[in-house]
């Protein structure tokens, strides 16, 4: 099997990618869609259904894309121009035209990384640096974590001495060093500058974090990091008869995820009488109408699946570092003066929402180390709010929503907010919400992946009992989660189960 380069694929499919009268495909997406075309062509060459006489006859009666007859083969220029070169013997180009129209309309191309699959299974590998000599040991901590600071004593004093962890009711000794793991920032070492007893009611991680921060702000506990004394370092690892003093070690592991192609399929049956009457009365073709219905429904369902998985895998907003003290976690309440920061009119309260969105976007960068959030999925009402407010540093003006498209009959892409966030409308939202996400400059830099395998397979037959025609479509694709997406889980084994969401 010959593997084509990116340039070769773009050159081969350029006429179809840039065909006059076809919906425009952004340059950044052309290489991906060219790969999808290549996978589709490979399926044409091996699958018999594309050469089935009845399917070819049905498609030939209504599709305007090129249908190549005899042994001519086909080329992208003919498909793009809608030119036929002979009697219909196979429908590959016709299906390719349908793929060309439908695939770029998937929302996955805008908010997911798109990685076309070459086979029904794919693999994602993640290399992780780990503290300790056994990278797969239970409780092994991941190093170089974007969310958690380094263990600043691991190569220093911490290698020679184990420090006690702070807990509820701990009584400190002046000058002693203690350790604590903050949920949001990781391991720290704290030296007691005064005698203090940790509050006995700090009996869970959140309360303990708050209590220790209070003592740090009071100056009772001071963050510290030190190397070991030379006299200690000289005796490390059994030197000169010393014992129980090994060097601290680090290692790495390579985790593998498997992504498997799954299928969607729909069929439609109709009577000969319906087809005849539809053609005679309305001048419509039953095959054409039903094929459009089936293909559109499959596309809408994939769009819904992608949005659902993004919302399901996202963290609850307005929590942790993005929660304003005194306000309710997970909810931005326009009736809460803390959330809207004492706004005097609606325009000011809308600007408070913009600030909350910025906080969520920055938190994505802190937790992933990749970049700030750059797209938003939101319900219609939220998009109307975003469209109605001035995003500049100015008076909080409020007016008609003229800046965005909020009509989902036209497009689910609303526009660009403040020059930095691409906004998409969830037209089927059950309640008002917004989700902030990040997709980087290339298709590998995303939190979730859409992996198309075979974009569209047409099927046609007749019911053996009543001889009425039946037609159907299949599509195969995978959905994968970035192995680094769950940033807060520092122990790698806890989040590497499978690349498939479940």
UniProtKB/Swiss-Prot annotation:
It holds the Pfam family Gp23. InterPro entries: CAPSID_Myoviridae, Gp23/Gp24_T4-like. The keyword Ion transport does not apply. One of its GO terms (cellular component) is viral capsid. Keywords: Capsid protein, Late protein, Virion. A proteolytic cleavage by the prohead core protein protease gives rise to the mature major capsid protein during virus maturation. The record marks 65-66 as: Cleavage. Belongs to the T4 phage capsid protein family. Major capsid protein that self-associates to form hexamers, building most of the capsid in association with pentons made of the capsid vertex protein and one dodecamer of the portal protein. The major capsid protein self-associates to form 160 hexamers, building most of the T=13 laevo capsid. Folding of major capsid protein requires the assistance of two chaperones, the host chaperone groL acting with the phage encoded gp23-specific chaperone, gp31. The capsid also contains two nonessential outer capsid proteins, Hoc and Soc, which decorate the capsid surface. HAMAP family: CAPSID_H_T4. Homohexamer. Interacts with the portal protein. Interacts with the capsid vertex protein that forms pentamers. Interacts with hoc; one hoc molecule associates with each capsid hexamer. Interacts with soc; this interaction reinforces the capsid structure. A total of 960 subunits of the major capsid protein forms the 160 hexamers. This is Major capsid protein. The lineage of its organism: Viruses, Duplodnaviria, Heunggongvirae, Uroviricota, Caudoviricetes.
